[in-house]
Amino acid sequence: MNAKRLMVLTLLLVAAIGATAALKDTVEKDFALRSTNKQVSGVMNKVAKLKLNADEQLAMKFLYSYMPLPDMTDYSVDFYKMNVEYALRTRKEMTWGSKVPDREFYHFVLPVRINNENLDESRRVFFEELKERVKGMSMRDAALEVNHWCHEKVTYRPSDSRTSSPLASVKTAFGRCGEESTFGVAAMRAVGIPARQVYTPRWAHTDDNHAWVEVWIDGKWQFLGACEPEPVLNLGWFNAPASRGMMMHTKVFGRYEGPEDVMSKNNCFTEINVTENYAPTAKAVIRVVDEKGAPVSARVDFKVYNYAELYTVCRKQSDKDGYTYVTSGLGDLVVWASKGNRFGFEKCSVGKQDTVVVALDKTVGFSGVVELDLVPPVERNTVPPLTQEQIDVNKKRLVYEDSIRGVYEATFVNEAKAKTLAEGWGLPVDKVTHFLIGSRGNYATLISFINKASDKQRALNLLDVISDKDLRDVSLEVLNDHFYNTPDLGDGSKFYFENVMNPRIDNEMIEPYKAYLQKALNKLNVKAFKADPYKWADWVKNNIVVIDGWNPQNLRMMPTKVWQYRCSDADSRDMFFVAGARAMGIYARKDLVTGKVQWASAKDEWHDVQFETAEQVTSVQGDLKMAYTKTQRLDDPKYYYHFTISKVDDGYPVLLNYPEEGYNDMFKGGAKIDEGNYVLITGTRLGNGSVLARLCFFGINHSNATDTDLVFRTSDTDVQVIGNFNSEDKYYDFATKSTKSLLSTTGRGYYILGLINPNHEPSNHALHDIESVAAEFEQWGGKIVVLFADEDASKRHKWAEFKKMPNTVVYGTDLNGAIADELKQALNLGSDNRPIFVIADTFNRVVFVSQGYTIGLGEQMINVIHKLNEGK
C-alpha cells in the first residue's frame, strides 16, 4: 500500500472515530436530559441498567433519547433490545455492513419507526427470511433483490389513512403506497441497507399524494418504487409526477446533521427537504407584516391545492424581521400566515418572484370571496436507460412473483367457504361473506371469534363498527375484550355499538382496554362519573399530565398506558377519556368531523369536553344553507373532490372531515354546523393540472341562517385539437378473439383509448376513477378501448378488482406496441409510460391526452365530453 493511500485511510479512520465519539457524547447528554422527566424516568433507568456491550448500549440509548412518548410507553424494553441486536448483526453478517457509516446506520438502519405504523417484530422476521437470499450480493443488487421479495409479498391497493404494520401488510398481501413504502423501508433496514421513506404530502398537478423508498447505496441516496421492482435504481412510474412535485421530504430519527436542507427539527426527528433530488427547485422568500407594514413573527404555512383544500406541505415561523423561506418545486404555493386572530395569504409563484410579502390584513370574522389561479410545475421526465433484455427479464420475474403471492391469496376464505360458515352459524350470508373475505389473511381470527361468541349476532354488530382495515389486522384479544367486557346497557341500537362497544376511537391501532380500565377505575368513584361524565373529565384533566413536544407525529398512546404512566400528549389524553367512558358504559366519541371530544346522555345529545377551559359545553349550532345549481357537467359535487369546508380557528383553517359524500346528501336540505367562522373552498382542475380555486369566507350564528353559494369556476377555453391519431390502427380484441381496427369497434364519433399496465398504481387509479363515473360514461355511450402491452400483461391484471367498469369498455392488446409508438410520436409524449388515455374521434383528431399518475381522470374526461356535446 503506497504512503498516500495509507494517509487517506488513516484520516478516514480518525474522522470515523471522531464522529462516533461526537455521536456518543450527544446521545449521552440527551439520554441524561430525558431521564430527568419523572413520568418516564423509570423506563430510562431500566435501559441505563441493562447489561449490554458498548455498541448495544449506545444503540439503546440512541433510540430512547429520541423516540416519541407512545413508542416508549407502548412497547417493551425487550422489544427494542431485540431490534438493536438484529440491527447490529447486519454490520457483521452482511457484506456491506461494515461499509455503512455511523451516521447512516444510526439514522437509517437502527430506527424501528418509519411512519405512523403500529410497530411489530418485522425486523427479526425479515432478517431471517432475507439473509440467505442476499448473501454475497453487492449492496445495489441486494436492494433490488429485496424489492423483488417485497413484490412477492405485497402489491398496491388503496385503503384508509391508518398505516398497517409491515407484518400486517404481508398478511393482507396488499397496501397503499404509504404502507408499501413502510414495508419496503423495514425490509431494507432489516438487512442493514440504509433506507428512508420519501413522501410528497400532496401533489400540485393532481389530487392525492405518494410515498416511495430511498436507499443509501455506495455513498449516494437513490430511489425505487416500493413493491414495484425495476431492473435498476432511480426508476419508477413516478419519475414524471415527481418532476412536477412542489415538496418531497422525509423524517429522520434523532438529531441528524446531514447535507440536506432542513425543514424543521424537534425532540424526535429532523425533517429534511429532498425535492431537489427529483425536480428543479428555487428558494421562495416570504416576509410577514401587519396591516401597517411592520414585520411580524408569525406562523407561516406553505400550501398546495389538493382534494379541494389548501393543504400544508411545509410549516415555518417567520423571524423577528418577518422573514422565512422555503425551497420547493417551480409552481404556485399559497402562503398563509397567521398570528392570534389575524391572518393573510398570498399566491407565491416559486422561481418567478424574489420576495412575497404577506400582510396580516384579515381578522377572524372576515367574509368575502377570493379567487386564485394555481399552476403546478411542468413535467421534466428523465429515466435511466434500459436494455430490452433487462425489461424482458424483469417482466418474467414480475409474473412469477405475482404467482407466488397468488398462491398465498388462494388460501383466504372464498365465497363458498363463507356461505358454509354463515349457514352453520345461522347468520346472514352477505354480512359474514363481507367480513371474512375482507379480512384477507386474518380470516382465522374472525372465524375463531364468531365461532366462540356467546351471541353471534352481537359479534357481527361489533365487526360492523370497525373499519375494513381493522378486519385485516385486529387481534382475537381485542375482539374478545370489547365483546365480553363492554357494559350491557340494554341498548341494541347502532348508536350503542358505535359509541360504547366500538374499540375504535380515532385513527389508532385498536387495542384491548376495557377489562383493564374497568379494574383500574373501580378504585375511583365510577358511580359519580356515570352520573356526571364531566366529573370524569375533571379527573382526567387533574391526573393525566400532558407532555408537549414528545409526540410530533401525533401517534396514539394506548389508553392502558396512559393510565399506567399518568401522562400523554393532548390527543392521547382525549382518546383516554373516551376509552374510560366507554369502559364505564358512557356513550362517548371523538367526533369524526370536528375532532371534538364528546359524551352523550341520550342519542344525539352530545356534550363537548374542553380540557383546556374546563367548561361544560353543549355545542351551539347554526344553519348553513348552501345553494348549488347543477350543471350538465356536475350534477352532485363531492366533498373532497370538488369542495371542502374548514373552520378558521385562530386565523388558521382546520378542515371539517365530513364523509366522502355528495352535496345532495349532506348539504342540499341545509346542514347544522357549529357557530364560528369558515371558508368554503371549491376548485376546478384543468387538463394541464392547473386549478381555478375559489375561497368563500362566511360566519355561522345560531340566531340566523347563513346563505352561501357553492360555485365552481370554469375555463373559457374551448376543447381544442391537440394532435392526430389514426383510428384505423389495429389491436387484438379479447371479446371477439380477433384483430380489429379501432374504428370498427368504436363506430363514428368520439371514443376513448387507454393504454395501461397491470398491477400498476397509476393504471389502477385511472381505472378506479373511470369506475367512479361509470354511469355517466354509459349515458354518453361512446366506446372506451383499454389495451394491455401484450397477453402476458393482461394475465397479470387483477380483473376482479375492477368489476364496476362501464359496460362500454372493451379490452385488448396493442399489437407489437404500434399504437403506443404512434401516440408517443403524434402527441409528442416524452415516453410511452402508462397509463395513457386519449379522447379522439374517427376523423383522427385528438382533443384530450393524459399520461401517468392522475387523480380524477374519469371526471376530467367526462368534462371534456360534456364540452364536446355543448359544441354540437
Name the predicted role of every residue range.
Residues 799-834:
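Short, internal strand/loop/helix patches
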Residues 32, 132-133, 137, 142-148, ...:
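Hydrophobic/aromatic-rich core segments of domains that either
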Residues 282, 290-311, 330-332, 532, ...:
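Short, ordered, surface-exposed loop/turn motifs in non-cytosolic proteins
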Residues 742-770, 783-787:
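Short active-site neighborhood of thiol/selenol oxidoreductases, capturing the structured segment around
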Residues 341-363, 686-715:
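Structured interaction patches on ligand/partner-binding surfaces of diverse proteins
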Residues 27-172, 208, 390-565, 613:
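Secondary-structure boundary elements
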Residues 833-872:
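Thiol-/selenol-based redox modules, centered on thioredoxin-like
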Residues 321-334, 338-342, 348-352, 661-688, ...:
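Short Pro-Gly-centered beta-turn/loop motif in secreted/extracellular proteins
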